[in-house]
C-alpha cells in the first residue's frame, strides 16, 4: 500500500509501531445473521432495517452487507464508556455503487451529506460521523470540548471512488492536537483539535443512513448504496499503515442474489433487467467479446426515477443476463444531474457511446469510449454537441448514430412548433454540425406527439430504412410508432407512407403500456429488437418489490412487401425448453390441461385451424381464476382477458384487464392461426402468426395460480406444444419448431447447429423429432 505519511512529528511519536496487533473497541465484521449484525466486542446484536430481506454478499474479507440505497440501514446502541475521549481511530472498508441521492429534483451544487457511520448529534454538539455527499465528497465531523462544545469538520480533498473498494480512516489525537482523514492510506484532510477532548454521544450509531430521515415518497434518499465490509473503532491513534493490510484490488459485486426475491411471484427470470433498483429505456444493444450487451437508464439508489446512470447487462444468448458494473455515471460539470439515453455504435474507430448529458439547465450530447472489449469500463471524451440548435424546444435528448452514403450522422429527439421532430447533425472535419436541417418531423401533434424520444434508424436493406420513435402526448398518450422510408443525399428522411404504423399489434400499446423505445441490433443476418415494458405500478409497490420495470424478449424483425414490420420470437429462445413438456394434436371441443407444464416460466405454442367460435390458451390458472388469451373467429379479435385473474391491477382506466386487438389480417376458415406465448413472472410476450407481437405486464397474486390449458368453444383442429422454461438450461439447438414443420419430415436428423444429418451419427449429440439424443 502506498501511504503518504505526513503526520506531525508529535503525532508520529504517539503512534504504536507498525505491525503491532491492534485491539478494537468496537467491531462490526458485517456478517448478516438472521437479518442482524453483531458487534463482536460487546456481543450486541442489531437488526438491519430493510424492506426486503437483509443480504450479505462477498466482501474484501468474508462478507459485506448490501445496502440498497432506499430502505435498509442499521441503528446500534453502543456504550460510550468503551471509547476514549483523547485518542480514536475509526476505520471503514466499503464500496459505493452510487452516491447518496439527497435531492431527486436537481443536482446539488452545494452538496449535502448522509452518514455512512456515526452518531453525531449536531444540535447537542456530541459524537462523530463519517459522511458522504450526493457528489462523492467525504467528510468527517466530530465534537470537541473546545469552547464548551464545538464541531470540527474535515472535508476530503478527493472524492470517494465509485464501483471499487476503499478504506476510510479517521484519526483523532488530542496530545498531538491533530485530526486526520485518510482515503486508501493517503491523507486527504486534517484539522487541529485545540487540544480538547472528544465529546462522545450516548445516541444511537447509524450505519448506512443519516440520523435524520429524508424521503421522496416512500423512499429514503439520505442513505448509502453499495457494500460495507468492515467497521472498527480503536482507542488508539493509528495510521492506516498500522491497521491490518487489506487488498482492495478485487472488483466488488453489487448484484443482488436471487434469494432477495425468493418470495416474489412477479420477478422475471429470463427477461433483461438489472438486479435491483430502477431501469427505464434500454439502449445500445450491441455485441462484443462473445456477448450481447444492453445499456440502460439506471437508478441504483432505489426503484424510482432520479439521477440516472448508464447501467449495463450482458448475455451470451439473450435470455440469461448478468448485470455488469455501472458503465457511465454522473460526475462531470456537464452531466452532474444525469447521464440519460443515447446509443452505442461501431464505426471505423471501434465501439463508441453517445449519451445525453444533463446539468440543471441544459442537455448536451457527450461521447464515451470503452476501455476494454467487455465494455465494462468507459472513459468520457467530452461534449460533441453543445445543446440544441436554435428554434427548437429545450427538450433535446436521446442521440442516435447512423451512416449513409459515406457520411456519418447523429439524430436527436426534439420538438419543433409543438410537434415531435429530430435534429440532424453531420460529421464534418472532426465536428458534428447542424445547418438548421430537421432530419424528420411530424405533422400532427395528436397523431405524432409533441416531443420525440428514443429515435432509432435501422438499415433494412434494398434502400429501405426503419425509423422508430416514441412520441409524448399523442391523442392516446405514449406509444412507439414507426415509418419505413429512404435516406436523402443530405441525410434527411423521406417516408414511404404518410402516417406512422404501430410497433405493438392492433393498438395494444397506448398510455405508456406495452413495448416502448426499442433498441435494435443486426447480427448474423438477423435484425433483433427489444425494449422497455413498464410495469405501470405506483411507487409504493415498487418500494415493496425492490425493482421497477424490465425489457421484452428479443424479437426478430423484417419488412413485408407492403413495408409492414414483421415480428417473431428470437429463435434462440428455444434453448430454454426443458424436458417438462406437453402436446395436444387433435380435434378439440372444450378444454385440455397442458399439465405437467405449469408455473410462471412457460412457453405455449399452438396452431389452430380456424373454424368457428373461440380458441386459445389459459395460464396463471387455479380453481378460482385464470388469464385467458382467446381469438374470436367471428370478428377477428384477439383478446387477453385478465378480469377473472386475481392480480395487482396496473391498468385501471386504459384497459381494465381487457387487452383486445383486431388482427391486421383475419385468417379465413380453414387457415391456420399460430399463437406463441412466453410467460415469465409478470410479463407475457405474445406473438401471432409470426407477424405481429405485443408485450403485457401482469401481476397475479394467487400462489396456486400456475396451471395452463388449451381450449376451443367449437370443434377445432389444434396442434399445441408447451414447455416449462429454464434460463439456466445449457445447450442451444437453433431449431425452434421441428415438431410442426411438415416440410421437415418426421424422421429428419439434425446436429446442435440445425444442420441436417443423412443418418444417426455414431458419436455426439443429435436431434430427432425435436428431442436431443447422444450417440456413443
Predicted regions and their residues:
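Extracellular glycan-associated modules
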Residues: 22-259, 588-605, 612-648
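Terminal processing/anchoring signals of secreted or surface-associated proteins
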Residues: 1, 21, 732-738, 754, ...
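Bacterial Sec-dependent N-terminal signal peptides
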Residues: 1-23
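Beta-rich accessory regions
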Residues: 256, 488-511, 519-731
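Beta-rich carbohydrate-recognition and catalytic domains
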Residues: 241-398, 402-447, 461-511, 531-583, ...
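Short, glycine-anchored, charge-dense loop/turn motifs used at functional sites
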Residues: 690, 752-755
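C-terminal tail/sorting-segment detector
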Residues: 3, 765-776
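Residue-level detector of functionally pivotal "anchor" positions at catalytic/ligand-binding pockets or at interdomain
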Residues: 255-256, 726-753
Amino acid at each position: 500500500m502506498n501511504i503518504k505519511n505526513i503526520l506531525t512529528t508529535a503525532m508520529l511519536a504517539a503512534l504504536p509501531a507498525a505491525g503491532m496487533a491492534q485491539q478494537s473497541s468496537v467491531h462490526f465484521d458485517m456478517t448478516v445473521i438472521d437479518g442482524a449484525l453483531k458487534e463482536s466486542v460487546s456481543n450486541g446484536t442489531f437488526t438491519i432495517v430493510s424492506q426486503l430481506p437483509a443480504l450479505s454478499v462477498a466482501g474484501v474479507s468474508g462478507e459485506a452487507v448490501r445496502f440498497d440505497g432506499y430502505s435498509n440501514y442499521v441503528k446500534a446502541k453502543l456504550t460510550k464508556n468503551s471509547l476514549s475521549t483523547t485518542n480514536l481511530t475509526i476505520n471503514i472498508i466499503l464500496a459505493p455503487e452510487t452516491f447518496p441521492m439527497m435531492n431527486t429534483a436537481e443536482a446539488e451544487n452545494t452538496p449535502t451529506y448522509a452518514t455512512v457511520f456515526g452518531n453525531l448529534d449536531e444540535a447537542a454538539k456530541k459524537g462523530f460521523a463519517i459522511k458522504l455527499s450526493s457528489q462523492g465528497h467525504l467528510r468527517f465531523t466530530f465534537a470537541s470540548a473546545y469552547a464548551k462544545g464545538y464541531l470540527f469538520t474535515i472535508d476530503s480533498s478527493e472524492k470517494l471512488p465509485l464501483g471499487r473498494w476503499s478504506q476510510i480512516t479517521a484519526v483523532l489525537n488530542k496530545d498531538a492536537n491533530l485530526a486526520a482523514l485518510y482515503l486508501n492510506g493517503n491523507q486527504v484532510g486534517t484539522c487541529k483539535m485545540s487540544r480538547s477532548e472528544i465529546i462522545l454521544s450516548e445516541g444511537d450509531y447509524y450505519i448506512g443512513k443519516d440520523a435524520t430521515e429524508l424521503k421522496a415518497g416512500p423512499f429514503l434518499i439520505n442513505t448509502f448504496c453499495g457494500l460495507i465490509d468492515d467497521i472498527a473503532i480503536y482507542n488508539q491513534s493509528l495510521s492506516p499503515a498500522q491497521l491490518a493490510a487489506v487488498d482492495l484490488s478485487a472488483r466488488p459485486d453489487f448484484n443482488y442474489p436471487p434469494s432477495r426475491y425468493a418470495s416474489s411471484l412477479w420477478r422475471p427470470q429470463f427477461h433483461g433487467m438489472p438486479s435491483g433498483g430502477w431501469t427505464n429505456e434500454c439502449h445500445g444493444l450491441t455485441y462484443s467479446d462473445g456477448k450481447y450487451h444492453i445499456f440502460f437508464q439506471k437508478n441504483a439508489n432505489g426503484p424510482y426515477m432520479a439521477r440516472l446512470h448508464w447501467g449495463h447487462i450482458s448475455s451470451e444468448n439473450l435470455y440469461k443476463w448478468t448485470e455488469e458494473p455501472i458503465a457511465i455515471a454522473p460526475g462531470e460539470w456537464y452531466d452532474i444531474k444525469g447521464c440519460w439515453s443515447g446509443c452505442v455504435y461501431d464505426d471505423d474507430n471501434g465501439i463508441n457511446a453517445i449519451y445525453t448529458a444533463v446539468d440543471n439547465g441544459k442537455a448536451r450530447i457527450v461521447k464515451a469510449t470503452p476501455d476494454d472489449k467487455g465494455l465494462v469500463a468507459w472513459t468520457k471524451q467530452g461534449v460533441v454537441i453543445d445543446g440544441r440548435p436554435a428554434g427548437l424546444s429545450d427538450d433535446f435528448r436521446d442521440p442516435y448514430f447512423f451512416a449513409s452514403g459515406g457520411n456519418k450522422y447523429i439524430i436527436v429527439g426534439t420538438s419543433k412548433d409543438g410537434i415531435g421532430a429530430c435534429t440532424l447533425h453531420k460529421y464534418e472535419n472532426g465536428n458534428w454540425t447542424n445547418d438548421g436541417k430537421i432530419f424528420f418531423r411530424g405533422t400532427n401533434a395528436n397523431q405524432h406527439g409533441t416531443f420525440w424520444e428514443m429515435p432509432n434508424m435501422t438499415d433494412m436493406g434494398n434502400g429501405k430504412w426503419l425509423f422508430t420513435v416514441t412520441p409524448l402526448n399523442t391523442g392516446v398518450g405514449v406509444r412507439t410508432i414507426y415509418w419505413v422510408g429512404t435516406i436523402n443525399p443530405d441525410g434527411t428522411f423521406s417516408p414511404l407512407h404518410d402516417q406512422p404504423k404501430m410497433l405493438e399489434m392492433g393498438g395494444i400499446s397506448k398510455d405508456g403500456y406495452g413495448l416502448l423505445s426499442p433498441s435494435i441490433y443486426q447480427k448474423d443476418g438477423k435484425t433483433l429488437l427489444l425494449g422497455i415494458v413498464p410495469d405501470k405500478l405506483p411507487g409504493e409497490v415498487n418500494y415493496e418489490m425492490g425493482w421497477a420495470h424490465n425489457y421484452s424478449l428479443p424479437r426478430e424483425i423484417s419488412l413485408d412487401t407492403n413495408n409492414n414490420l414483421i415480428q417473431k420470437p428470437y429463435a434462440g429462445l428455444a434453448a430454454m425448453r426443458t424436458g417438462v413438456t406437453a402436446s395436444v394434436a387433435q380435434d378439440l371441443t372444450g378444454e385440455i390441461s397442458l399439465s405437467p407444464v405449469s408455473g410462471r416460466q412457460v412457453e405455449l405454442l399452438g396452431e389452430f385451424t380456424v373454424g368457428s367460435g373461440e380458441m386459445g390458451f389459459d395460464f396463471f390458472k387455479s380453481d378460482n381464476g385464470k388469464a385467458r388469451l382467446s381469438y374470436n373467429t367471428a370478428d377477428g379479435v384477439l383478446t387477453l382477458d385478465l378480469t377473472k385473474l386475481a392480480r395487482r391491477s396496473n391498468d385501471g382506466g386504459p384497459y381494465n384487464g381487457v387487452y383486445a386487438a383486431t388482427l391486421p389480417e383475419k385468417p379465413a376458415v380453414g387457415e391456420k392461426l399460430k399463437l406463441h406465448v412466453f410467460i415469465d413472472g409478470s410479463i407475457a410476450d405474445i406473438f401471432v402468426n409470426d407477424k405481429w407481437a405485443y408485450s403485457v405486464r401482469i401481476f397475479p397474486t394467487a400462489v396456486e395460480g400456475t396451471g395452463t390449458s388449451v381450449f376451443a368453444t367449437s370443434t377445432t383442429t389444434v396442434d399445441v406444444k408447451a414447455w416449462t422454461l429454464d434460463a439456466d438450461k445449457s445447450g442451444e439447438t437453433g431449431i425452434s419448431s421441428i415438431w410442426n414443420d411438415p416440410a421437415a419430415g418426421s424422421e429428419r436428423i439434425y446436429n446442435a447447429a440445425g444442420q441436417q444429418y443423412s443418418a444417426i451419427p455414431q458419436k455426439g449429440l443429435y436431434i430427432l423429432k425435436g428431442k436431443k439424443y447422444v450417440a456413443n
